[in-house]
């Protein structure tokens, strides 16, 4: 019976994967081609469609097993993709590159969870007594929510670093139709204006990317702090000690230290924002380790 349900879940999740993939392709096409995509509502609709399927899968597991589905890596990845989808849907109208980042991340996560993760890791087993606690839902959901925010912020920081340091305006012109590419960061309209006005708009786009990255990471850092504290309380309640230095705890602490360093550099006006963005980009690698650990 369990194998049949897993096959059914895989079939349904194909729709979520395709929705995120189509959305990703449209958003990247909109950023990299001059002509405005007339069906701009389609990628956002695909994201919403994909998100509804993921939410349905989580709710189905919740009702079937009578607890919030965050007990294994598969369920955690589904929840992470749902969080990233929500963030993307909310903020894509403010900065269209968020649509490209968020939908691509969701596509990769769903693809990994359904096509690479071994079936044994997707099956749910009976929870250990220590996991039958309300702290499970609170701690894990807050941690994954924080990772979703930090992933989005770190990706934006990475783009900020690349655009400011590694690409000149001439090289960008060779890669993209420059007016459309930059203006699309801020608005969903193509522009033909060039020259000083365009350069000023480009700088505004850079600052918009960096500012949103800072806001995402700040909120994610607060959530991560709350998640670590709730996890410590849960550990003390279940096992009698607040910290045991297991891999999950260690990587969560490393993640906290990396983004604490980012915030320290970012707030200190003596440092250039580019250094803070480099640290945040490093945090993206750390999050990958802590998520898949």
From Swiss-Prot:
InterPro entries: Cyt_c_assembly, Cyt_c_biogenesis_CcsA, Cyt_c_biogenesis_CcsA/CcmC
Major subcellular location class: plastid
Domain of life: Eukaryota
Keywords assigned: Chloroplast, Cytochrome c-type biogenesis, Membrane, Plastid, Thylakoid, Transmembrane, Transmembrane helix
Record-level GO cellular component terms: chloroplast thylakoid membrane; plasma membrane
Localization per Swiss-Prot or TrEMBL: Plastid, Chloroplast thylakoid membrane
Membrane spanning residue stretches: 12-32, 39-59, 78-98, 99-119, 142-162, 216-236, 250-267, 273-293
Membrane topology, as annotated: Multi-pass membrane protein
One Pfam family named in its UniProt record: Cytochrom_C_asm
Single GO molecular function: heme binding
Record-level GO BP terms: cytochrome complex assembly
Summary of subunit composition and partner proteins: May interact with Ccs1.
Protein's job: Required during biogenesis of c-type cytochromes (cytochrome c6 and cytochrome f) at the step of heme attachment.
Family (UniProt): Belongs to the CcmF/CycK/Ccl1/NrfE/CcsA family.
Protein name (database record): Cytochrome c biogenesis protein CcsA
Biological source species: Cyanidium caldarium (Red alga)
Name of the gene: ccsA
């Amino acid at each position: 019976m369990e194998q049949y349900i897993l096959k059914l879940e895989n079939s349904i999740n194909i729709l979520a994967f395709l929705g995120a993939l189509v959305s990703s392709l449209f958003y990247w096409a909109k950023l990299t081609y001059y002509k405005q995509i007339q069906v701009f509502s389609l990628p956002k609709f695909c994201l919403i469609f994909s998100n509804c399927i993921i939410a349905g899968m989580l709710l189905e597991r919740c009702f079937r097993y009578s607890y919030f589905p965050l007990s294994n890596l598969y369920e955690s990845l589904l929840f992470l993709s749902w969080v990233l989808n929500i963030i993307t849907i909310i903020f894509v109208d403010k900065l269209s590159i968020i649509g490209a980042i968020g939908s691509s991340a969701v596509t990769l996560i769903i693809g990994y969870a359904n096509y690479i993760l071994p079936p044994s890791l997707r099956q749910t087993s009976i929870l250990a007594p220590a996991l039958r606690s309300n702290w499970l839902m609170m701690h894990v959901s807050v941690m994954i929510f924080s990772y979703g925010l930090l992933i989005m912020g770190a990706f934006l920081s990475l783009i900020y670093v690349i655009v400011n340091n590694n690409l000149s305006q001439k090289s960008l012109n060779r890669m993209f139709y420059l007016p459309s590419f930059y203006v699309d960061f801020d608005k969903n309209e193509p522009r033909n204006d060039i020259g000083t006005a365009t350069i000023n708009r480009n700088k505004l786009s850079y600052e918009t990317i960096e500012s949103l990255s800072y806001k995402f990471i700040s909120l994610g850092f607060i959530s991560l702090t709350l998640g670590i504290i709730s996890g410590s309380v849960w550990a003390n309640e279940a096992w009698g000690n607040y910290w045991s230095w297991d891999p999950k705890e260690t990587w969560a602490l490393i993640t906290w230290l990396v983004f604490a360093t980012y915030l320290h550099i970012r707030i200190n006006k003596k440092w250039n924002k580019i250094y803070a963005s480099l640290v945040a980009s490093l945090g993206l690698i750390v999050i990958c380790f802590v998520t898949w650990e």
